[in-house]
A protein has these predicted regions:
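Long, hydrophobic alpha-helical segments that serve as membrane-spanning/inserting helices
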Residues: 1-34, 41, 49, 70, ...
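Membrane-entry segments of alpha-helical transmembrane domains in multi-pass membrane proteins
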Residues: 26-31, 46-52, 74-82, 97-104, ...
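C-terminal functional regions that serve as terminal interaction/effector modules
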Residues: 418-419, 423-427, 434-438, 446-474, ...
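A cross-kingdom feature marking solvent-exposed beta-strand/loop segments within repeated
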Residues: 42, 74-78, 96-101, 147-150, ...
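Juxtamembrane or sensor-core-proximal signal-transducing alpha helices
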Residues: 170-182, 495-506
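Pore- and pathway-forming membrane helices of multi-pass small-molecule/ion transporters and channels
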Residues: 9-18, 33-74, 84-89, 106-173, ...
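Alpha-helical transmembrane segments of multi-pass membrane proteins
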Residues: 61-62, 354-366, 376-387, 402-414, ...
């Protein structure tokens, strides 16, 4: 701790960021690391034994192909085979018509690249077209580097082997021999979330960050998609399991902010918490065995009063609704998503995106051809790899690619100087490479925001030390050339994406916030009563809110990187947006508390008041796009009937009013926190 105190604050924040990113714990990560690590060592062994070139490309196939579960790995393997056919076909098309004409090669490769980049952004299978784009723009440089067409054709045919045998290898390892099934990961994830929920129910613990809660909720939704595709039993009882996922997400996210010490520890409340924890444990055991949980618990009047006193009635009701649900309930038919985005042919940003990528590649090609420096051909690959839809995400990818390349180059330099002279055989080489590949696999399986560092580090290391050599190598020029190529490609891409049709998310962010608040207003319009349809709708929209808040948070981080914006305007936009996100989360949890109280009343007394909140929130959201939103001021009229039956409801809704009043005023020249008390609200 004393060492951290002596470091500058930015360094401490950077270390904390990497600690959070790299220490991510999720089901399936350890098997994925092992599969990736073993696969890399097998690729080195096979490539060195049979003298197969392009080792770095084979390693890249593994890092992109081995996924967190067997079904996803199999799906990506199929995409890789399709992409390989399209890649080789496009290369032979270029060679056939323009082998000896560099200008004609570019004229043919350019439209192929543009079409692939356009489809990468607009089509569901964008990964296939991304791979084709990389090979098309890179493969057309082979004739310029080699004077013999036969050699070029041989290298192109080797590319088929280099791409397909790692695909076969990852299918054997990740799908057939040591599969990590999505259904097993789902059972583990649900049990982990319920463990956390029980801990917060019984002990006074600090709440976990909301971003972590939202990411865990999104992870459960992704696993649900894989389970539907991979497991027949899950599909048969999908309605129950989807309801289970929604219920567990709600319990986990709600109890995260629960503090048992905030309520009087009467004997009735203590016994009720123990009973609730016991029911959650029963759900855990059923999930661990892959069984649909059925409960015979019927809440008594005393238990209902205890649940209401400690704000647990809604959690109790959602849990019981799951326990009494028929496992054979037919699922709701899911709408099939379109293969292309709706505005694929009407939004000019997609074609501009393709043109910008092509322009960056042409500038890099002209530069390295003009200076006759073929070793920096990685600059063209960099232009394609860092091409993201907007300026902020492109900058993020540039930083990750540069950071991974820097780490890989340093490792390659140390390896060449200190280790390579002492190696005599393939066994020693594998022992030395094992920790490097393990480190790369560990980083590559971390959070999506930083995982690319691991992939780039291993690929850069392999390019500098293992590419097309089948024995000791002491040439440091390769290390220099690969690093310089990545730097040049990053600089060119940064200039192009910043000044040529920059796609800023500064205007999109308020619209995204408006959509999120619109979802929150829909939650407020759902009748606050224990009716099965209302509860299920409430839970599903609530999961959507987790995804929406997380998307807004990530968009804020990307907008912070858009240096082409005015610094003061950017800072003001980010501060206001983060305040809206923070208050929106608080409003959602405060509205949960009103459900616990409103359920005791006749619902006919409540719609007007709930509609008042929803209308105010929708009005505020409508003004975000034009920066005309003011902090809502809501007047609550005390209803004698509700005050007589349950006086705590009015206090809870007054708290919601206070949270509304703290929403930022977007018409002010600078963000000033709302200190005035909402009309009708009490402290």
């Amino acid at each position: 701790m004393s060492a951290l105190n002596s470091l500058p604050l930015p360094v401490v924040r950077l270390l904390a960021f990497f600690h959070e990113e790299l220490s991510e714990r999720r089901p399936g990560r350890v098997p994925q690391i092992v599969q990736l690590w073993v696969g890399c060592l097998l690729v080195i062994l096979i490539s060195m034994t049979f003298e197969i070139p392009f080792v770095a490309l084979s390693l890249a196939v593994l890092f992109y192909g081995i996924q967190s579960n067997a079904f996803y790995t199999k799906f990506v393997a199929i995409l890789f085979v399709v992409a390989r056919v399209l890649e080789i076909g496009s290369l032979f098309l270029i060679y056939k018509w323009s082998y000896g004409e560099p200008l004609i090669r570019l004229i043919i490769a350019g439209p192929i690249l543009m079409g692939c980049m356009f489809l990468m952004r607009t089509h569901r299978l964008g990964l296939v077209f991304f791979a084709v784009a990389i090979v098309a723009i890179y493969g057309q440089t082979f004739p310029a580097m080699l004077d013999y067409p036969e050699v070029v054709v041989r290298l192109t045919l080797w590319c088929i082997v280099v791409g397909l045998y790692p695909t076969l290898l990852m299918t054997l390892i990740g799908v057939l021999w040591f599969p990590s099934r999505a259904i097993t990961q789902m059972h583990q994830a649900l049990n982990d979330r319920l463990d956390d929920a029980i801990s917060h129910l019984t002990d006074s613990l600090a709440p976990l960050p909301e971003t972590r809660i939202e990411r865990e909720a999104l992870a459960l939704q992704k696993l649900n998609v894989f389970c539907l595709a991979d497991d027949a039993n899950w599909r048969t009882q999908s309605a129950w399991w989807q309801s289970c996922v929604a219920t567990v997400t709600y319990i986990y996210s709600t109890l995260n902010r629960y503090d048992p010490t905030s309520f009087a520890d009467s004997q009735a409340i203590i016994e009720f918490r123990q009973k609730l924890a016991s029911e959650i444990n029963k759900l855990q055991h059923a999930v661990a065995e892959g069984q649909c949980w059925q409960s015979d618990w019927r809440i008594t009047e005393s238990e209902a009063m205890a649940a209401r006193e400690c704000n647990l009635e809604n959690i109790c009701q959602t849990l019981l609704q799951l326990g009494q649900m028929d496992p054979n309930t037919p699922p709701t038919p899911a709408a099939k998503p379109p293969s292309m985005v709706a505005d694929a042919f009407t939004n000019p940003d997609y074609m501009r995106y393709a043109v910008k990528t092509l322009l960056a590649c042409l500038i890099c090609y002209t530069f390295y051809s003009g200076v006759d420096w073929e070793g920096i051909h990685t600059c063209m690959l960099t232009c394609v790899i860092v091409a993201n839809p907007n300026v902020g995400s492109s900058y993020q990818k540039m930083v990750l690619r540069f950071g991974g390349a820097f780490c890989g180059a340093i490792l390659a330099l140390l390896f060449t100087l200190l280790v390579m002279p002492w190696l005599d055989n393939i066994v020693e080489l594998l022992f030395v490479l094992a920790p490097i590949f393990l480190l790369g696999a560990w980083i590559a399986t971390s959070s999506e925001r930083s995982s690319y560092i691991g992939t780039q580090m291993v690929v850069t290391f392999a390019l500098a030390t293992l590419e097309n050599v089948f024995g000791p190598v002491y040439d440091l020029v390769e290390i220099r050339d690969r690093a310089m190529g990545i730097i040049i490609g990053t600089v060119v891409s940064a200039v192009i994406y910043t000044f040529v049709w920059p796609e800023s998310e500064a205007r999109t962010l308020p619209q995204k916030l408006a959509g999120t608040l619109g979802m929150l207003s829909k939650v407020m319009r759902i009748p606050r009563q224990q009716e099965v349809t209302a509860l299920r709708t409430y839970l599903q929209i609530r999961i959507g809110l987790h995804a929406a808040f997380n998307a807004c948070e990530e968009m804020c981080q990307r907008v912070a990187l858009e240096r082409q914006l005015d610094s003061e305007e950017r800072a003001l936009l980010i501060e206001r947006s983060q305040t809206v996100i923070r208050q929106g989360r608080d409003i959602l949890h405060a509205w949960d508390a009103t459900w616990n109280s409103a359920q005791a009343l006749d619902n006919a007394l409540q719609p007007d008041r709930a509609a008042q909140f929803a209308d105010a929130l929708e009005k505020y959201a409508a003004g975000l796009a034009t920066a005309l939103s003011r902090s809502p001021q809501i007047t609550l009229e005390e209803t004698p009937a509700s005050q007589a039956i349950l006086p705590t409801l009015l206090k809870q809704e007054q708290h919601v009013c206070q949270l509304f009043a703290r929403l930022p005023d977007w018409t002010a020249p600078a963000l000033t926190p709302a200190t005035e008390q909402a009309q009708g609200a009490t402290q």
